[in-house]
Amino acid sequence: MPIRILTPIRALLAALLITMAPALPALADTLVFGGTRGIGLETVRLLAGKGEAVTVLVRETSDLTALNEIDGVSTTVGDAMDRASVTRAFAAGEYQVVVSTLGGSMTAGFTVDSVGNINAIDGAKAAGVKRFVLVTSIGAGDSRAAAPAPMLKALNQVLVEKEKAERHLIDSGLQWTIIRPGFLNDKPRDTQGILTQKSSAMGAISRAEVARLITESIGNEATFGMIYSAIEE
C-alpha cells in the first residue's frame, strides 16, 4: 500500500497517492531509537518483516520481551541521553537509516524528547548516516494551533522539547522527514493513515499505521525535507 499524502490544496479535493521512489538500497541497515515499545516497536516489526537489517538501541534495563519475539532484529546497548553511548552505538554498525520515536513520560520527564533525539541526530551526522526519520507529535512547531487546549495544557513541556529536536534536525543537513502523529491508539491497521502537510490537521491514528507510514517514507524521496501530520483518513 503506497503512502497517502495530503498537501494543503489536495486535502480539499482528494488524497494524493505518491508512488514509492526508493533512494536507498532495498535492504538498508536501520538503527532505531525508541524501538522497544509503541510506534518504534511496530516499526521494527514491519522493517524486520520486509527483511531489513534492523538494530535497536536498548538500555541495560529495557524490557526486551517483545523485541526477542521478532526474528532478525539486533540490539546494541546504550542510552540516548548519553552522547558517548550514542556515538558507540553508531560505531557498532554501518547504518544507512535512523528512525527515532523517542519520547518521555510524566514520571521520567521529557528531556529525552529533545536531548535524546538531538544526540541521535548528531550521532547520525558524525557517522555519515544520511537518512533520518523523526517522530514527534501534532502540537509541535507550526502545528501547535491544531492541538486541543487540554492537550496543550497537559503536554506543553513535551511539545516544547519535541520542537527543539525538530529544529535541530531541520538544521542538520541530513535527508530528514518529520512525522507528527495525532491522538495515538492501539487499534489494528483497519483504517488508512495518511500524511498531510496541513499544519491544522488533527485526529486519531493507530501506532501500527504510523509505523507503516514511517517505513514507507524511508526510501521515498518525495518525503525528504518534509514535515507531516499523521492522522486517519
Listing of model-derived features with the role each one plays in the protein:
Residues 96-132, 163-164:
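NAD(P)-cofactor binding segment of oxidoreductase domains
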Residues 57-62, 80:
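N-terminal Rossmann-fold cofactor-binding loop
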Residues 188-193, 217-226:
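Glycine/proline-rich active-site loop of Rossmann-fold NAD(P)-dependent oxidoreductases
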Residues 116, 179, 201-216, 226:
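Substrate-positioning beta->alpha
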Residues 30-50:
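N-terminal Rossmann NAD(P)H-binding glycine-rich loop of SDR-like oxidoreductase domains
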Residues 74-96:
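Conserved Rossmann-fold cofactor-binding substructure of NAD(P)-dependent oxidoreductases
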Residues 22-28:
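Sec/Tat signal peptide C-region and signal peptidase I cleavage site
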Residues 166-188:
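Conserved beta-loop-beta element that borders a ligand/cofactor-binding pocket
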